[in-house]
UniProtKB/Swiss-Prot annotation:
The modification N-acetylthreonine is found at T2. This is 55 kDa erythrocyte membrane protein. Its main location: membrane. It is found in: Cell membrane; Cell projection, Stereocilium. Keywords: Acetylation, Cell membrane, Cell projection, Lipoprotein, Membrane, Palmitate, Phosphoprotein, SH3 domain. Signal peptide: none annotated. Residues 282-451 form the Guanylate kinase-like domain. Residues 71-152 form the PDZ domain. Residues 158-228 form the SH3 domain. Heterodimer with PALS1. Interacts with DLG5 and NF2. Interacts (via guanylate kinase-like domain) with WHRN (via third PDZ domain). GO terms for cellular component: cell-cell junction; centriolar satellite; cortical cytoskeleton; membrane; plasma membrane; stereocilium. Belongs to the MAGUK family.
Length: 466
């Protein structure tokens, strides 16, 4: 059974609250004066292909088309790359393929995408390969003179788009990238400002907060998803699964998520569009980790130390109550028929069975905790992350990894293997990763990070706002 999130009224109200917060943030930004950038010293002079430097712009001379040629001169005194890539168009003319945002040429504003280069320092570029021309541009120093025919097409304004990377990328290891030196290296979770996406395969971006101002090439979502899908198709069909959820353990068929797991494996990820919001309170703390990593100890410690702040939602079960159990305290006890009806109505965010009895956590239970202005703690399976990662629940997702200290026993090695399997498939959902070298240390780091997330600007999925 595929798990689905409910679409109740509370979800709509939370969505509106974050939308209003974002709108207020945008209005405040628009009221601030924009910084003015000053271009580098560049000399340009217009002429025409008949050699005339006349100020007019004749369309034809004696029945022949006359194209405007621009002479561009500037001095290159450092080893800094110019920040452009070249290509040959259908007429085998050398044109500017892309200009890297923040690079030397971009700061000058002297060239634009589509400009045709005729000469480099007096040398005609005809009959030269792109590699030869790129090398010439890279190695040239001192005064540089270019003759170009400007591209007359309109130029679009700069983009204002931010994406969270959902995979690690190293351009030096990419055989598809047209220029490895122009690539941008990033890691899962990095926020990338998208500068240009004119090329359907290679976008330009820069990592937010990086000291490097110039942009670099990154694979577009379409290219990355095609790449991953192609690799998956070429992989052996009988490859063994590294998922830790197939082994026998408590709640071995928890959440009936085998179909969800299959779809997770086919769900190719690349980037997630995000927006930056002012500080707001996260309503749910989600703990993710392999079985035996210590999530229960951490959860129980949070509940006992901060009962006024954190609450664990009481689960529902079809198991008969024991003599010492009180309905609504450890469990809500319901019939199998009622629970089956509730599952069909998508009232459970997760559910499963153990020893013939069904267990599950309802959305409504979590909502009731939020209405008390408290934070709900969930220790769920990773397959459920898609369902809880919404504006309605506003989760802060923490991955708990096993200790990397002490003796490497067989059990610890298996735990580390299971943990890595979860990380490799779901890391793009994590807000924080912690190594559990001790409950006290982990608790301190977790609470500090959670408080920091609730009191400072945050990057959230654009779906939380729009």
């Amino acid at each position: 059974m595929t798990l689905k999130a409910s679409e109740g009224e509370s979800g709509g109200s939370m969505h509106t609250a974050l939308s209003d917060l974002y709108l207020e943030h945008l209005l405040q930004k628009r009221s601030r004066p924009e910084a003015v950038s000053h271009p580098l010293n560049t000399v340009t002079e217009d002429m025409y292909t008949n050699g005339s430097p006349a100020p007019g712009s004749p369309a034809q001379v004696k029945g022949q088309e006359v194209r405007k040629v621009r002479l561009i001169q500037f001095e290159k005194v450092t080893e800094e790359p110019m920040g452009i890539t070249l290509k040959l168009n259908e007429k085998q003319s050398c044109t500017v393929a892309r200009i890297l945002h923040g690079g030397m040429i971009h700061r000058q504003g002297s060239l634009h995408v589509g400009d045709e280069i005729l000469e480099i320092n007096g040398t005609n570029v005809t009959n030269h390969s792109v590699d030869q021309l790129q090398k010439a541009m890279k190695e040239t120093k001192g005064m540089i003179s270019l003759k170009v025919i400007p591209n007359q097409q309109s130029r679009l304004p700069a983009l204002q788009m931010f994406m969270r990377a959902q995979f690690d990328y190293d351009p030096k290891k990419d055989n598809l990238i047209p220029c490895k030196e122009a690539g941008l290296k990033f890691a899962t979770g990095d926020i990338i400002q998208i500068i240009n996406k004119d090329d359907s395969n290679w976008w330009q971006g820069r990592v937010e907060g990086s000291s490097k101002e110039s942009a670099g090439l990154i694979p577009s979502p379409e290219l990355q998803e095609w790449r991953v899908a192609s690799m998956a198709q070429s992989a052996p069909s009988e490859a063994p699964s590294c998922s830790p959820f197939g082994k026998k353990k408590k709640y071995k068929d928890k959440y009936l998520a085998k179909h969800s797991s299959i779809f997770d494996q086919l769900d190719v990820v690349s980037y997630e569009e995000v927006v930056r919001l002012p500080a707001f309170k996260r309503k749910t703390l989600v703990l993710i980790g392999a079985s035996g990593v210590g999530r229960s100890h951490i959860k129980n410690a949070l509940l006992s130390q901060n009962p006024e702040k954190f609450v664990y939602p009481v689960p529902y079960t079809t198991r008969p109550p024991r003599k010492s159990e009180e309905d609504g305290k450890e469990y809500h006890f319901i019939s199998t028929e009622e629970m089956t009806r509730n599952i069909s109505a998508n009232e459970f965010l997760e559910f499963g069975s153990y020893q013939g009895n069904m267990f599950g956590t309802k959305f409504e239970t979590v909502h009731q905790i939020h209405k008390q202005n408290k934070i709900a703690i969930l220790d769920i399976e990773p397959q459920t992350l898609k369902i809880v990662r919404t504006a309605e629940l506003s989760p802060f997702i923490v991955f708990i990894a096993p200790t990397d200290q002490g003796t490497q026993t067989e059990a610890l090695q298996q735990l580390q293997k299971d943990s890595e399997a979860i990380r490799s498939q779901y890391a793009h959902y994590f807000d924080l990763s912690l190594v559990n070298n001790g409950v006290d240390e982990t608790l301190k780091k977790l609470q500090e990070a959670f408080d920091q997330a609730c009191s400072s600007p945050q990057w959230v999925p654009v779906s939380w706002v729009y």
